Structures are given as C-alpha cells and as structure tokens.
Amino acid sequence: MGCLGNQLLIALLLLSASGIYCVQYVTVFYGIPAWRNATVPLFCATKNRDTWGTTQCLPDNGDYSELAINVTEAFDAWDNTVTEQAIEDVWNLFETSIKPCVKLTPLCITMRCNKSETDRWGLTGTPAPTTTQTTTTQASTTPTSPITAKVVNDSDPCIKINNCTGLEQEPMVSCKFNMTGLKRDKKREYNETWYSRDLVCEQNSNETDSKCYMNHCNTSVIQESCDKHYWDAIRFRYCAPPGYALLRCNDSNYSGFAPNCTKVVVSSCTRMMETQTSTWFGFNGTRAENRTYIYWHGRSNRTIISLNKYYNLTMRCRRPGNKTVLPVTIMSGLVFHSQPINERPKQAWCWFGGEWKKAIQEVKETLVKHPRYTGTNKTEQIKLTAPGGGDPEVTFMWTNCRGEFLYCKMNWFLNWVENIQNGSRWTSQNQKERQRRNYVPCHIRQIINTWHKVGKNVYLPPREGDLTCNSTVTSLIAEIDWINGNETNITMSAEVAELYRLELGDYKLVEITPIAFAPTSVKRYTTTGASRNKRGVFVLGFLGFLATAGSAMSAASVTLSAQSRTLLAGIVQQQQQLLDVVKRQQELLRLTVWGAKNLQTRVTAIEKYLKDQAQLNSWGCAFRQVCHTTVPRPNDTLTPNWNNMTWQEWEKQVNFLEANITQSLEEAQIQQEKNTYELQKLNSWDIFGNWFDLTSWIKYIQYGVLIVLGVIGLRIVIYVVQMLARLRQGYRPVFSSPPAYVQQIPIQTGQELPTKEGEEGDGGGRGGNRSWPWQIEYIHFLIRQLIRLLTWLFSSCRDWLLRNCQTLQPVLQSLSRTLQRAREVIRVQIAYLQYGWRYLQEAAQAWWKFVRETLASAWRDLWETLGRVGRGILAIPRRIRQGLELTLL
C-alpha cells in the first residue's frame, strides 16, 4: 500500500506539472520592430530663409540618415498618403503665395474695344487677309520644299534682341468702358488692355468699335489677387512625426508600383523636393539620374518619365518689354488692376537647350523595355505628340515664370524633336505651325484654371520690365496611347500631380507599433509594484531599433529592453527637437495653412506616446518590456516560429485577434485591481487602533446581529432534527396526535414494567430486542469505513515520513558534524583575527605615542631656536646703540 501511495502521489505531481506547462498565456512585448500604414499629417522642413520658408516650414538641419532593413514591403506611388499630402500642400502653398482674396466677378460689362485689333486677332469675324494667310493658302495647294530647322543657342544674337524668327507681338486689345466708381451718381470712363484670349466680342459688327466682354463673366467663382506675389521654386522635405517613420523602396527597378520590394530603407524625413507647377514637363526635380526610368500607374496608362540628366536638358523663358500697371477703383475696398501699354511688346517665348533628340530617343527605348508596355518595338513608330484639345493648360505647355503664367504653343518644338517635315501630322498644321525650331512662342494670361480644384482665378497683370527664368527639365508627364499594333503615341499630359508622385512615390508613411502579443508558458506572478530602470541609456536614435526588423522574433526579443528604452528616448528626443525648431520659428504663431499643419503634427506625436503608455497601463504592464499576464492564449492554432519569423510577419497573422486580446487583458487587469483592493482592506486589521474606529464598531454590530440570528436558526434546526429522530423511533408528541390516534404500547417479554412515568420516553431504546433502523446502520457503516480510510492514510503518511527520516538521518548527522567542525574552524580563525587586531591596535598606539612625543620635542627645540634668533634680531639695535655709546665715550 505504501508503494502504491507513493506512485499515485508522483503521478499526480507529474500530471499537475505537465498541465501547468502546457497552458500558454498571452505575453505583452514592448519595443518590437513592427509597423502599420498610417495617414497622419507630415510636417515640412526647409533651408529657405524667405517669407514662405519662415512661415510655412520648420528649419532644416540636414541630419537625416537612412537605415537599411531586411524586410519586404509593398509600395504604390498613386495610392500613397505622402504624395497626396504633397499635392494638397503645394496647392495650398500655390494659393497662399499668389493669393486671391476678393470674391467677385470683375468687369462683367460691355466694353468698346479697338476694332482693328479685334479683327487682327480674330475676335470679330474673319481676320483680314495677310501675306501670311496667302502663304498658308498656297502651301495647302502646292507642295513646298522641306523647311530647314531653326536651332538657337545662348550665343545667338536673336536671343539678346528678342527677334528670333516667327515671334510676334503679344495679342492684346485696348478697350474703354464706363463704370460707377466711388460716387454712385457719377460714371467714369476707364481704359483697359486685355489679352485677346480673355475677351469675347460680337461678330461682324459694322460699328467703329467692337463690343466685347470678358469670356468668364458667367463664372461665379472668380477671384482677383489682392497683391502681386513672387513665386519661385522652393526646396523642402517632409518629415514624419515622432512615433512614425518613412519607408523607401531602394530598388532601381521600382516603377511606381511594387507589391514586394525587398530593398527597403527607413528614415525620418524624405529627400529634398521642388515646388513644381507645370504641365507637360517637370522642372528642377530631385529624382533625375544618369538613366531614364518610367513610373507607370497600376490601373491606367498614366506615366511620369524621369529624363536622363546626362543630356543637360534646359528651358529658358523670357518676357521682353515694359508694361505700366494702373489700379482701377471699382468701389470702396475693391480695386482691379489694368495695364496700359506704353509700346507694343514682343510676346514671351521659351527656348530649349541640351541634347533633346537623344533624350527622347532614350525615352522610347526605355518604354519598349518596360514590362507594362505591349505596343510596337520599333522606336521610329513611337511619337511624342501634343494632346488633342481641352483647357488651355492641356493644349499649351503651362508653367510659372517668376509669378507669371506662361502658355506656350509647342508645335515647333515637337516638329524639331521628332524631325517632322511631311506626313499627316505636318499637313494638319497651319502655316505658322509648320516650323522645326527649338524655341516656342508663349503668351501670358490673367485668368487661370486651377490645376488642383475646379475653378478659375484672376491674377494681376505681369510685372513691369523683362522677366527671365531658367529651369532644368527633369521629367515628362505623359499618357501612353496605342493607336494600333504598329504605332504608339506618348501624349503629353496636364496632370500636375504626377510630378509629386515621381518625387515621393517611393516613400510610404508607417506608424511604429511597439506593442505586440505572443504566447508563452510563463504566467504573471504578483509583485508589490513595478520598478523603473533608472540606469542611463545610450540613445542610438529613434530608428535604430528598426534595424532588427528583419531578424527572428527570438533575436529581437533578447534586445527588447534596450530597444524599448531607445524607442521611448527617441520619441522624446524627436519631440524635443521638434519643439526646439518650433520655438525658433516664431512666425508659426500666425498659424498659416502649413503652420497649423506643423502644430497638428506635434499634437499627433504627443497623442501617440500617451496612447501607448495609457494602453500599457490599462493592462498592468507600465514600464515593462516583457509583461506576462494571466490571460490564456485565445487561439491554439497560431504559434510563432521564434527562430524564423519576424515580428512584422507575426503581427500580420494575429492582427484579427488584437481586439479580443486587448479586451481580455483589460478585464484581467480590472479583476486583479479588485483583488488587490480587497487584499489592501485586510491590511487595516494589522493596526490595533483601527479596531476602535466608529466605522468598525458599526461592522461589529452587524456581525453580532448576524451571529445571534445564526444561533437562533441553528437552535431551530437542531429542534427539528431531534423531533424527526424521535418520530423515526415510533413516537409522536402528544400535542400533535390526531383525534383517532390510539397509542400502541410495545409488549416487552422477560422484563419488568416501568416503575416511573418519566422512563416511558426512554423505554423504546433500552429493549434487548430493539435495533437501529437500517438508515442509521448504513450511516454508521460509512463512518466506520471513513475512519478506517483516514487511519490508513495517516499510518501510510507516518510510515513514509519515518522511512524518509531514517534515510535522511545519516545525511543530517554528517551535515551536523561538518557544520560543527566548520564552526570550530571559524571560531579559531576569529580568535586569531581578534588577537592580531589587538596586536595591531597596540602597535598603532605605540607608534602614535612615539610620533607625538617626537613631534612635541622637535617643536619645542624649534620654538626655542626661533625664540633665540628672534631675540637676537631684536637686540641688534640695542647692541648698535651700546657700541656707539662706547665709541663716543
């Protein structure tokens, strides 16, 4: 029996241990390298010290390094919050830099315009026949010889005098109109000069003047600029708020969409970028390399082509001549600006420098090699073409030159690049367009279609004097059109937003998620409280902990403590740096569009930090890098591979369980707090003074009442049990007998009758022939078996303990003897140490006495010597006096 008991006990212990070990619990890890896509506002940084740079962006310190991480991530230039924010922000910059501020429909009245000018520019009827038109008619009927291409360079004389072949005067019309000014009862005549494209005139009128009006008078959302602002390219970069990061696809084959980019780097800011606003071309971009590459939309034929910077492609624009701008007061507070012309100026124009033909040929060769392209492989069948029609910003190349909006007719340039001098494209052009030149005519407009939103703005006339701007052409905005199987058109596009998809399309914004859950076999143990680690941390930078993003979960978990401290310190450091530059940027208090955006960025950073800390605190995991819990694992089928799986991969698998795990952790923490509260209430019994508290006496009264009620109830239960026991013996109380009840007296043989009346109640239990009822006997049997079982357990345990004690007795005796010998050795050594210590004390005292006496004797001798020397010195005058006296005597 003893051996069997031991075996059962061992088996029970093994089963308990295996059961505890097999149960896995949720463990919270803080500081893991994982992230998810985010859409929070970014803030900008720039080195520009102009008005815009100080009011819109934070100062840029240029210290933004990148860190390579061994992960695979998806990138999309068109479905990208970074590019969308850039497009929206540059539009806001465009609006605030050239700011329309007065909502009105200006000058929607009939004007009297110069009829000769309206006829000349084709506003009223058919233009008068000219030599140019005659030549056009002849050209359409008779073949002409090939036209020699006209190419100009920087040293060409026509550039200096603005007299290159084909350039004409600006198409402008002088008009007069009467309008009520400040005095409503009096009208005043005004003179105004308009671009011909901004006017609509009555056709075939026989009057001396043409009746014209603005062609946008029926547009209700027209705004006039309240002041002339300077617009120029501005370089800036985007930065992520603290707690967020920017991933970049560093693959040279990236073409705007990559579901599995394996070369990923992480940084806190993007590269520098330019504020570009133009159609057809991108200017001064930062993505130009010594190669041509194409970003292609994943679901359409929209492309943005980065040109090879080796060919040094440039565009230089000029607006010659002088203008005089005068204000026209419409009413109080509303002023419209007119531009009377002193002398008819030459029209604006742009010329293109660099090896354009080689660059376009390389674009065609790159297009043929692109995996999305399915057209002809013959580059001579791929043509660079202009759009068919639409807004002026589409049909013309639209750009901004020092705050002025240029619309350039690009037929000459396309004919020159494609070397077109015959064919359908050549014959479809009018005579003026049939030229092959590396420069194009342009015109300036005041009424502009907005490029980001539907609407129109009215801006001030151009500045006086010459306007010149130089730009580097870095990209083409185009759509790839397959005409048929043998021909492909690269059609220039007016999608200004594509420029920023090229600049920032290889970035994506992610939110660092340092909190993760994973199952472990360790259960939370109760502690008195969380203790902070107060050791200093060498801050490696906020993004340093992401270096382990490609490592296995086990390797990353080993460094969680340092990573989490680096993460927290990095977030705080980022916030401090952001706060410092905001303090230096005093103009931020003006809260411009981007100023408010920068302020919102700091608020976002603080919210994220507080959110993470509050979440950890709600789970009881504050200030812990690895926090074990009492929550069982919710899904047994998901088990992490600690050696071959990264934290990012594990997070993707268990993302759907996050809500349930979070709720379970909060419930477990609430229950633990309740248990802690109940346990703390028991601590009040430790202090004897709390026993005499008034609130305690009220509880004592309650306890007393409950005890009295319990005693009364117990007495009632005992009485009922006794009555039932008597009934089981065959007796019933007299007061409860029914009327027809006749008490039966049992006949007892061989015994005397009872002599006392009081013995009648006990006579039923004294007969020799009486026995217990079978229920009572069964209960006694169970009690006897239970007593035997307990006796056997007691004896077995006692024997087992005795055997173990007998087994351990020699070991204990040997241990006792060893301890005794060790005690003797220690006692002897302590005695030696005490004797040596006393000897050292006596030696030190003797040495100190000797030193003291020696120093005292030396001091006395020195003092006597000094005294004698002093007295001798003091006696010198006396000796001299005595000598003199003796001499005189």
Swiss-Prot record:
UniProt keywords, alphabetically: Apoptosis, Cleavage on pair of basic residues, Coiled coil, Disulfide bond, Fusion of virus membrane with host membrane, Glycoprotein, Host cell membrane, Host endosome, Host membrane, Host-virus interaction, Lipoprotein, Membrane, Palmitate, Signal, Transmembrane, Transmembrane helix, Viral attachment to host cell, Viral envelope protein, Viral penetration into host cytoplasm, Virion, Virus entry into host cell
Region of interest (Fusion peptide), residue spans: 536-556
Transmembrane region(s): 705-725
Domain of life from the UniProt record: Viruses
Spans annotated as V2: 175-217
Region (V5): 485-492
Residue intervals annotated with topology Extracellular: 23-704
Lipidation (S-palmitoyl cysteine): 797
Motif (YXXV motif): 731-734
InterPro entries named in the record: Gp120_core_sf, GP41-like, HIV1_Gp120
Site feature: Cleavage: 535-536
Disulfide bonds: 44-57, 101-226, 108-217, 113-175, 239-269, 249-261, 317-350, 401-469, 408-442
Gene Ontology CC terms: host cell endosome membrane; host cell plasma membrane; membrane; viral envelope; virion membrane
Coiled-coil region list: 648-675
Renumbered residue ranges of the record's region V4: 408-442
Modifications after synthesis and translation: Specific enzymatic cleavages in vivo yield mature proteins. Envelope glycoproteins are synthesized as an inactive precursor that is heavily N-glycosylated and processed likely by host cell furin in the Golgi to yield the mature SU and TM proteins. The cleavage site between SU and TM requires the minimal sequence [KR]-X-[KR]-R.
Positions on the Cytoplasmic side per record topology: 726-889
GO-annotated biological processes: membrane fusion involved in viral entry into host cell; symbiont entry into host cell; virion attachment to host cell
V1: annotated segments: 113-174
Record's compositionally biased regions (Low complexity): 126-145
Signal peptide annotation: 1-22
Di-leucine internalization motif, short sequence motif: residues: 888-889
Function: The surface protein gp120 (SU) attaches the virus to the host lymphoid cell by binding to the primary receptor CD4. This interaction induces a structural rearrangement creating a high affinity binding site for a chemokine coreceptor like CCR5. This peculiar 2 stage receptor-interaction strategy allows gp120 to maintain the highly conserved coreceptor-binding site in a cryptic conformation, protected from neutralizing antibodies. These changes are transmitted to the transmembrane protein gp41 and are thought to activate its fusogenic potential by unmasking its fusion peptide. Surface protein gp120 (SU) may target the virus to gut-associated lymphoid tissue (GALT) by binding host ITGA4/ITGB7 (alpha-4/beta-7 integrins), a complex that mediates T-cell migration to the GALT. Interaction between gp120 and ITGA4/ITGB7 would allow the virus to enter GALT early in the infection, infecting and killing most of GALT's resting CD4+ T-cells. This T-cell depletion is believed to be the major insult to the host immune system leading to AIDS.
Entry's free-text remark on domains: Some of the most genetically diverse regions of the viral genome are present in Env. They are called variable regions 1 through 5 (V1 through V5). The 17 amino acids long immunosuppressive region is present in many retroviral envelope proteins. Synthetic peptides derived from this relatively conserved sequence inhibit immune function in vitro and in vivo.
Name this polypeptide is given: Envelope glycoprotein gp160
Organism expressing this protein natively: Simian immunodeficiency virus (isolate PBj14/BCL-3)
